[in-house]
């Protein structure tokens, strides 16, 4: 099967039809959710943080970051994907239409951390004569380093096409000032194998990635998600949703009462 970046540029490939799959296809949602939770786990943020989500797409990773107490800003090159994200009732943070290959357009030291799911492999896509992969990589990592606080961590899941492209990405990140390496989850499995570029922007703390890899017996992201849902009661979830809708200015949001979240008796 052809890789998406071989078919068309991202702003064209992720059109209304393709973007719609991210809100209707449960398999895509499940995979994206699992990778997003793993990226946030590797980010290892100390308390609520200000996070940039690069290539946020339909907002799945943005939403998961917010559900863990973080403030998340999303950026993506596809208008269709951002439209899907805007239609979501879950996302509170801002969304930005931007090509990461032209640089990360934020002030120095803005973000505590950065996540990215299935995005940075597009930087190697030379779909236009002006898009030189090495130049785009340089611009991306240099501006990303500047936009992060010192000691901040970036975790980017991606699909490397070749060992050469994988090394090219790692070398460019190091030249920009980052420390770190690549974490490979489930390295023995062809279907479950996932690559995460884990980077640290300076700071005094040493980044050790040797113990970060998951094998087949490792922690299951679905189990973590289930436990998290169990920790929030039905009443708490309903009140949380109501509060979100009020902040967005939605009309006719029911008032909270002692009956909120209670199961109704069967009708006669």
Curated annotation (Swiss-Prot):
Q: Which residues cross the membrane?
A: none
The name of this protein is 18S rRNA (guanine-N(7))-methyltransferase bud23
Provide the GO MF annotations for this entry: rRNA (guanine) methyltransferase activity; rRNA (guanine-N7-)-methyltransferase activity
Q: Which domain of life is it from?
A: Eukaryota
What this chain does, per the entry, is described as: S-adenosyl-L-methionine-dependent methyltransferase that specifically methylates the N(7) position of a guanine in 18S rRNA. Important for biogenesis end export of the 40S ribosomal subunit independent on its methyltransferase activity.
Annotated organism of origin: Schizosaccharomyces pombe (strain 972 / ATCC 24843) (Fission yeast)
Q: Which reaction does it catalyse?
A: a guanosine in 18S rRNA + S-adenosyl-L-methionine = an N(7)-methylguanosine in 18S rRNA + S-adenosyl-L-homocysteine
**Family per record:** Belongs to the class I-like SAM-binding methyltransferase superfamily. BUD23/WBSCR22 family.
Matching entries from Gene3D superfamilies are given as: Vaccinia Virus protein VP39
Subcellular location(s) per record: Cytoplasm; Nucleus
Q: Which gene encodes it?
A: bud23
Q: Name one GO cellular component term.
A: cytosol
């Amino acid at each position: 099967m052809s890789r998406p970046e071989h078919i068309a540029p991202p702003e064209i490939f992720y059109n209304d039809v393709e973007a719609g799959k991210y809100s209707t296809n449960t398999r895509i949602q499940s995979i994206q959710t699992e990778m997003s939770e793993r990226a946030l786990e590797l980010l290892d943020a100390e308390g609520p943080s200000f996070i940039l989500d690069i290539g946020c797409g339909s907002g799945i990773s943005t939403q998961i970051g917010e559900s863990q107490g973080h403030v998340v800003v999303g950026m993506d090159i596809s208008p269709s994907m951002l439209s899907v994200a805007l239609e979501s009732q879950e996302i509170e943070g801002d969304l930005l239409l931007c090509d990461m290959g032209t640089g990360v357009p934020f002030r120095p030291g803005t973000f505590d951390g950065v996540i990215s799911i299935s995005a940075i492999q597009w930087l190697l896509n030379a779909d236009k004569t002006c898009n030189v992969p090495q130049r785009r990589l340089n611009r991306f990592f240099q501006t990303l380093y500047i936009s992060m606080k010192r000691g901040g961590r970036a975790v980017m899941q991606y699909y490397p096409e070749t060992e050469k492209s994988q090394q090219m990405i790692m070398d460019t990140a190091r030249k920009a000032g980052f420390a770190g390496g690549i974490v490979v989850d489930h390295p023995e499995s062809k279907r479950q194998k996932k690559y995460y570029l884990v980077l640290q922007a300076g700071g005094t703390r040493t980044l050790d990635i040797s113990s970060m890899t998951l094998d087949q017996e490792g922690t299951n992201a679905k189990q973590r998600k289930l436990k998290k849902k169990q920790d929030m009661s039905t009443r708490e979830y309903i009140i949380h949703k109501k509060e979100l809708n009020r902040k967005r200015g939605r009309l006719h949001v029911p008032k909270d009462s002692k009956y909120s979240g209670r199961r109704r008796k069967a009708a006669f």
